[in-house]
Amino acid sequence: MIDANVLVEALPYVKEYTNQIVVVKYGGNAMIDEQLKAAVIKDVTLLNLLGVHVVLVHGGGPEINEMLEKTNKESKFLNGLRITDDETMDIVQMVLCGKVNKNLVNLLDKGIGLSGVDGSLFEASCLDSDLVNVGKIEKVNPQIILDTFEKGYIPVVSSVAKAIDKQGTYNINADLAASELAIALHAKKLILLTDVKGLMKDPKDESTLMERVKVSQIPLLKKEKIITGGMIPKIECCVKACREGVESVNIQDGRVMHSLLVELLSNQGVGTLIE
């Protein structure tokens, strides 16, 4: 029997998010595990039916690594970012814009696949010459996303960008792409799905989850080495989004079934809220 209390609890949140924009960075185990993937797709489909404008921004690190292995090419990283020479860039585009993007679109009844190149959605310059074809987003042109909303579609965006300082394209960190898009769209919420519970005082102890973190606390948390490694760029993306008008930013565990619905349509919340 359906628990009516659950539906009643969700009602004010449905009202709050109807006709609002939510940007979700989709990656990690939530993209690989078939059960988790199905749950995310169901969550996004339901949110769309409720009138929430959801954008999925995805990377595809594991799939890129797999394709590089097949071509006998080594995956190299610098400060957590993939060194993307011309050959690797071709593979990145093929995997992200082709395989990963189209597979996700195929699972969504109202999905429409886009890359950051389409409509010059993301315009970028070189981030670091040592990384070769890794870009820094200089401008976001969100009109193509707004057009898809008007027609009731769910945009699924791969994280590559049009180069403005050369001919060609750039590989973009998906967290950064999601953050910049959320800012440009004046999104109500940005959610980064990860493979950890959120920001924890002790990464090995999930009971130390920090459910709410103020932007003003971030420098001290870095100094105390609570924010380290791969969490640093995620937090920096969140801080920028908060400072530039995104109402709510969340880092949450993509391994939790239906975590998007729990976060958006209940009073429980998931992960770490940056405010």
PLM features: what roles do these ranges have?
Residues S259-E275:
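Short, basic/aromatic-enriched C-terminal tail that caps enzymatic domains
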Residues M1-R255, Q268:
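Nucleotide/pyrophosphate-binding catalytic subdomain
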